[in-house]
Amino acid sequence: MSIWLLKTEPAECGIEDIRNAEGGVMRWDGIRNFQARNMLRDRVAVGDLCLIYHSGVREPAIVGSAEVVRAAYADPAQFDPASEYYDERSRPEDPRWFCVDIRFRERFPHPLPLAEIKRTAALAAMVLLRQGRLSVQPVSEAEWRSIRGLCGVRRG
């Protein structure tokens, strides 16, 4: 099992959207960065855990967690000319972009703002602090435990 940080803008898809999706399961799509796409396609697996990070807001923060319930598959938006994620170079037989399905696990009692992440020695090596724009990032088990503790989670 691996752990990932998934960045999302809550105006498009926030932790509450994931919670309120049918069965708590949502397609996590719209990735249009090759490095993030490669991780999603090649490394993210069913059963992996995810931290949900709200970006594009006044105070970016880790707000909750989810679990991958379907491994990478072709992002259908790339084939839809009406979608903002349409890619005319993509073909169903050779897709360029991928998505996964995630299931809501929890909203943390307290969000963990980026400013606090930067001040926390145990999180100094996080990919988030080196490659901030990357929307799919690996997280170590030690980082996962530290983050959950800082967010007020007392178990798991």
Q: What is each stretch, according to the model?
A:
Residues M1-P10, A71-A74, E116-K118, L123-G156:
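Mixed-charge, low-complexity intrinsically disordered regions
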Residues M1-V46, E143, C151-G156:
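Compositionally biased, charged N-terminal/linker segments
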Residues K7-T8, H54, F104-E106, P138:
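Pocket-edge structural micro-motifs
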Residues E12, E59, D75:
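Flexible, glycine-rich phosphate/dinucleotide-binding loops
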Residues E16-I18, Q78-F79, P113-A115, I147-L150:
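A short secondary-structure junction signal
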Residues Y53-E59:
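Short, charged beta-turn/beta-strand-edge "cap" motif at the junction between a beta-strand
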Residues G64-L134:
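Aromatic- and Lys/Arg-enriched surface recognition patch
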